[in-house]
């Protein structure tokens, strides 16, 4: 892929990333702490699961919403650093309390998105 054909996708991801990261920053400023990061990652997993099932093949929409907005909103690296900084019990609880709900949320989002897609097809 040449540089010219990357210009629009990079701009779309950058714009989405700025929006998602700004939303995460605002939430973390309003409610600082590891549990806000947990909530952000679980909600982001739910939304990405839904997105995976509902956004059509339009590459720019997927890049903007998935890689950009939700990629900027969620944060695995902050989750990892926060876990390492905690004592062993809190870190273990935090890891389990993040990963299991995030996986379940992603699946729930995918199921909801699948049902939404089927309902749209039935109407069309």
Curated annotation (Swiss-Prot):
GO terms for cellular component: plasma membrane. Na(+) is not transported, but it plays an essential structural role and its presence is essential for fluoride channel function. GO terms for biological process: cellular detoxification of fluoride. Its main location: membrane. Pfam families: CRCB (PF02537). The keyword Metal-binding applies. GO terms for molecular function: fluoride channel activity; metal ion binding. Keywords: Cell membrane, Ion channel, Ion transport, Membrane, Metal-binding, Sodium, Transmembrane, Transmembrane helix, Transport. The chain crosses the membrane at residues 1-21, 30-50, 64-84, 93-113. Na(+) binds at residues 71, 74. It is found in: Cell membrane. InterPro entries: FluC (IPR003691). Fluoride-specific ion channel. Important for reducing fluoride concentration in the cell, thus reducing its toxicity. Belongs to the fluoride channel Fluc/FEX (TC 1.A.43) family. This is Fluoride-specific ion channel FluC 1.
